[in-house]
């Protein structure tokens, strides 16, 4: 079974990565498992815990992650892929690399840029860090 990890952030690049994975799965002889991973940046301020409970933060991350995953999850499910959505919190590249190792995925498929990308950048910073840190193939989708 081919196992893919697709980091998604709700951007058009994420959708294109899922489109690529659907085509890749169709060309593969056998089933494909797709892990869709959204990574929320941690809210880090000096006194955040004085004003917001840990439960409220976790609810916020879950709600934002669910929104970011919605379109790509529906697209992958409609294509008949076995999907496993997940929401992580932390440094995006580190969370992606750790998740890929934990789930023993075969390949990471991700957009070359995300929501926070600079318009003139050739490759987004998260994508660049993942490419350099991964020990498995990484496909960047434009």
Predicted regions and their residues:
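Structural beta-alpha unit
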Residues: 74-108
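Short, flexible loop segments at boundaries between secondary-structure elements
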Residues: 133-142
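Small/aliphatic-rich secondary-structure junction motif
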Residues: 2-52
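A short acidic, glycine-rich active-site loop
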Residues: 54-67
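General small-molecule cofactor/ligand-binding pocket signal
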Residues: 35-37, 84-88, 139
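Glycine-rich, Arg-bearing micro-motifs that act as flexible, cationic patches
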Residues: 107-132
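Amphipathic, non-transmembrane alpha-helical secondary structure
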Residues: 15-23, 70, 93-97, 101
